[in-house]
A protein has these predicted regions:
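Short amphipathic helix-loop junctions that connect adjacent transmembrane helices
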Residues: 64-77, 271-287
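C-terminal transmembrane helical hairpin of 12-TM major facilitator-type secondary transporters
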Residues: 317-361
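Helix-to-loop junctions at the C-terminal end of transmembrane segments
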Residues: 95-106, 302-315, 400
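Conserved MFS/SLC helix-loop-helix module at the cytosolic interface between two early adjacent transmembrane helices
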Residues: 92-129
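Helix-breaking motifs and short loop linkers at transmembrane-helix boundaries and internal kinks
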Residues: 74, 106, 127-132, 282, ...
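Juxtamembrane intracellular "pre-TM" segments in multi-pass secondary transporters
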Residues: 31-41, 217-256
Length: 435
């Protein structure tokens, strides 16, 4: 699951993950609706909600489908995991560039190109007859993964500062709904054929593109200075190098290392659980779709309801410890489960842990960042999350292929419990007064 922005935001409403910032093209000269200054901000937010909802449905629909489809083409567990790794890697490398283009050219063309790329990537998936074609489709999808960051910029453009949190909550609500609807839709469409979900999402993405084309105005402020070549060069520097340059103190380094632990472990679950339950229990794409839809429901309810109540009674460090223990125990227990039905219980435990720990941990991290570096360091936490999504699947796939089907989940659980031990040992450094 994606990273939540912090406990304070979670008390309001579930906030969106940070994602790619966005592509654009001067060649896209379609007549735009009226400028943002004359546009109704609420109407723009409705379009953004629909755009992000369909975009996340397209992302999450693949969770129960792609691993089994790739395996049917002869892919090994490592090759299946590589499909997720390539997507995350392409997103990590190109997101800053699309962000630069978004600031220079505008939000609308960036979103349109991103959505068109989504249609193309799903059509490539639908016609794929080899693992090489699957790789190409996932690299394309990662390259064009620009909608979320640009949507955040649109919300910033059309809302006042005092309404910003509610505006961002629109993206969070779309994300949560998409993570529930996507796996369920993928599982249901798979009953019509293994490729039916790809065609279905391509149609949805095309409808999404038509909606944005006709209803989304340009929102980039007219007086906003365009970034120059230096900003582009900086964007082209790989994120890990910028990350190393930004970390000067042990406290920040510890936080970022723990972010890496959290998202590496969870990425193993997303990447490989479909193969595991399919091989051991004969679970179908529909079965796995329902499982992940259930996990999405529990995650959303945890962050929208339970977290608010727990935050009144427990401090952030206690919430982090509880969440890490739940995730670690739930992941490590997966290989011991005797039947597929038990995965719904374990999935709920993992989702509750994730929904509690990530916002609380992000909130602690934000308090550790000095005001003048908060934006960059919060962005670097997202980079560590994406790096975890790159490393986790490929390492988990190697463990599944070389050791046993359950080995990746034992390792992921151990990694989460190691993060808990490190957090408790370093609590005096990590949990300190706000700077």
């Amino acid at each position: 699951m994606e990273q939540a922005p912090g406990l304070d935001a979670a008390r309001d409403r579930r906030s969106p993950p940070a994602a790619s910032l966005a592509p654009a093209a001067r060649a896209l000269d379609a007549p735009a609706p009226e400028p943002a200054a004359a546009a109704n901000g609420r109407g723009v937010l409705v379009v953004i909600f629909a755009t992000i909802l369909i975009d996340f449905v397209g992302f999450s629909v693949l969770i129960p489908i792609l691993p089994l489809f790739a395996e049917s083409l002869g892919a090994t567990p490592v090759q299946v995991a590589l499909l997720l790794t390539l997507y995350a890697l392409a997103q990590l490398l190109f997101s800053p560039v699309w962000g630069w283009v978004s600031d220079r050219v505008g939000r609308r063309p960036v979103i349109l190109v991103s959505l068109a790329g989504t249609v193309l990537s799903f059509l490539v998936l639908a016609f794929a007859r080899s693992t090489g074609a699957l790789y190409a489709a996932r690299v394309l999808a990662g390259f064009f993964a620009a909608t979320i960051g640009t949507a955040q910029a649109v919300v910033t453009d059309v809302t006042r500062a005092e309404d910003r949190a509610r505006g961002m909550a629109v993206i969070g609500a779309a994300f949560g709904a998409g993570m529930i609807v996507g796996p369920m839709l993928g599982g249901l469409l798979s009953e019509l054929g293994a490729k039916a979900p790809f065609y279905g999402v391509a149609v949805l993405a095309a409808a999404n593109l038509a909606l944005a084309w006709t209803r989304l105005p340009e929102t980039r402020p007219a007086g906003l200075a365009s970034p120059g070549g230096f900003e582009l060069l900086r964007a082209l520097v790989p994120t890990p190098l910028r990350l190393l340059a930004a970390v000067h103190e042990r406290r920040i380094a510890l936080f970022l290392y723990l972010f890496f632990h959290l998202f590496t472990a969870f990425a193993v679950l997303e990447a490989l659980i479909t193969l595991y339950v399919g091989r051991l229990f004969g679970a179908s794409m529909l079965d796995v779709g329902l499982l992940f839809a259930w996990i999405g429901v529990v995650l959303v309810l945890t962050q929208a309801v339970a977290l608010r109540r727990l935050a009144r009674r427990l401090d952030e460090a206690q919430l982090v410890a509880i969440g890490l223990a739940a995730m670690g125990g739930g992941l490590a227990a997966l290989p011991a489960l005797p039947g597929f039905g038990w995965f719904f219980a374990a999935g709920a435990v993992i989702a509750v842990g994730n929904g509690i720990a990530i916002p609380a941990f992000t909130s602690l991290y934000s308090k550790a960042c000095r005001a003048e570096q908060a934006g960059e360091l919060l962005g670097q936490s997202q980079a560590m999350a994406t790096t975890g999504r790159i490393v986790g699947p490929i390492c988990g796939g190697a463990l599944m292929q070389s050791l046993s089907p359950g080995a990746p989940f034992v390792a992921a659980g151990a990694m989460m419990l190691a993060a808990l031990a490190l957090f408790r040992a370093a609590r005096g450094v990590l949990v300190a007064p706000e700077v």
